[in-house]
Amino acid sequence: MGRIIKPAFTVIGMEGSTADGHGFIPALWETANSRFGEVAALAKTREDGSLCGIWGAMSDMNRSFRPWEEGFTRGLYLAGVEVRDDAQPPQGWVRWDIPGFEYIRVENNAPDGFPRTLKMIAAEGLTLAGAVHDFTDPATGKSYMCFPVRKL
């Protein structure tokens, strides 16, 4: 666990909603992964050419990047890749411009990681400043949950 500062960034991906029913997130990833070639050239890369990040970005239903509503059961999800700021989505893809935040970043390796981190945030007198995002670091293959605690 640690804190990171992430300035505003852009993700292009496949968007879905909890209204789409159980299993919508894996279905989004299946579609995004199978069509990745359509956005690969737009992806933001590091100096070594590796991708900067794969994001499971989340937002409230109004796309204002607030936490999911109704006890974290109602919201939007974007399965995608971090892209250059000037990138435009191909047909069928969606672009989200995610505001900058300070995040508490926790490795996503335990089923109780989400509620446990929410309790820790509350114990420190903090609150969520936005929606939690899933992040996979392509360089290491590790997955993290990013809990925003301060908007930049």
How would you describe each model-predicted region?
Residues 1-152:
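A solvent-exposed interaction/effector surface
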